[in-house]
Design a protein with these regions (language model features):
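Amphipathic alpha-helical repeat scaffolds of TPR domains
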Residues: 3-7, 27-46, 66-82, 105-120, ...
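Helix-turn-helix repeat elements of alpha-solenoid scaffolds
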Residues: 13-20, 45-57, 86-92, 122-128
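Structural signature of alpha-solenoid helical repeat scaffolds
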Residues: 64-65, 85, 102, 122, ...
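N-terminal leader/linker segments that initiate helical-solenoid repeat arrays
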Residues: 1-25, 29
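Charged low-complexity stretches with an acidic bias
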Residues: 60-96, 167
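Acidic, Ser/Thr-rich low-complexity linear motifs
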Residues: 150, 180-186
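Inward-facing hydrophobic residues that define packing positions of alpha-helical scaffold repeats
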Residues: 23-27, 58, 90, 97, ...
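TPR/TPR-like (Sel1-like) alpha-helical repeat modules
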Residues: 94-102, 129-143, 152-179
Length: 186
């Protein structure tokens, strides 16, 4: 089979409901060395694909183009965060935020985005898994005060005021006042 045009690839990724067709076009895109994340985003949002199929494509893409891996993992996380039809999807979102942070540990976005997907009513992803993730991040990001502030919020949700207060103090020591210049709320 000959090469596909970028328009053909986009069209298939966004509209096809046939897994075999999508897979064939995906394989062709890899052979053609298409390393622009944009058409693959369409693939990740294809409603006909199961979470396992989306993961298959995303993992293969990240392995094939290591320069795209960080963006691929962030996109996979956001897809699973938004498609919260099952509790597992929240945990998949956290899983991919963790993979993104492993590639670029100095980036704060995976940590903050993971916190944003937390649902306190359902405790998904598990609160303590988020806490552990952020605690690892404070040693790698250039502005740990940002993560300490989020940790303080998470500890508040867990009812642990001592650790919450400690994190607020660490945030103040590390970075001064929060974004916007306002003092922290007591």
């Amino acid at each position: 089979m000959g090469p596909y045009s970028l328009d053909d690839i986009r069209h298939t990724f966004s509209t096809s409901t046939d897994f075999n067709e999508i897979f064939d076009v995906f394989q062709a895109a890899l052979r053609q060395k298409i390393d622009d994340v944009e058409p693959y985003r369409l693939l990740f949002w294809n409603q006909s694909l199961t979470p396992d199929e989306i993961r298959l494509f995303g993992e293969k893409l990240a392995a094939e183009f290591d320069t795209l891996a960080y963006d691929v993992y962030l996109w996979l996380a956001s897809v699973f965060e938004v498609t919260s039809s099952s509790d597992d999807n929240y945990e998949l979102a956290l899983h991919y935020y963790m993979k993104a942070s492993a590639i670029r540990p100095q980036e704060v976005d995976p940590y903050l985005d993971a916190c944003d997907c937390y649902d306190p009513d359902l405790n998904i992803p598990p609160l303590m898994a988020l806490v552990d993730f952020l605690r690892r991040g404070v040693d790698t990001v250039p502005r740990p005060d940002i993560l300490y502030r989020r940790l303080a919020q998470l500890y508040d949700l867990a009812g642990d005021s001592d650790r919450s207060d400690w994190c607020r103090r660490k945030a103040d020591e590390q970075g001064g006042t929060p974004a916007g210049g306002a003092p922290p709320v007591a």
